[in-house]
Amino acid sequence: WLVTGYPWYGIQTPEHQAFLKAYQERFKDYPRQGSIIGYSAIMSLAAGIKKAQSTDTEKLITAFSGLTLSSPVGPITYRAQDHQSTMGSYVGRTKNEGGKGVMVDFRYMDGAKFLPTDAQVQQWRAKD
């Protein structure tokens, strides 16, 4: 089966390995997809506050326009036009290994490649 998910056991980037080690030391368990999404969301907020030097809503909106930060799955950018995150997803196949379902033959699909273009967003907004 073709699936999306979070193959924590097979991501070998230094950023992910650091996240995985810290997570397992703290929680004595492996991270789930919600773990990586939550971590990336909090790191995004921290980067936005640091850039804005404030928690004021308008300053954060400005700070998030084009904000790029590192994450365990690679860089994430918040598009200037609509503040959509480019965080992607892992896509692969399922396989039974030792009685457990695992994701194999996976690759990271950068969300930036799948978001609507700026022109499309402008067109949709014009209809609202």
How would you label these PLM feature ranges?
Residues 1-128:
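Extracytosolic ligand-binding ectodomains
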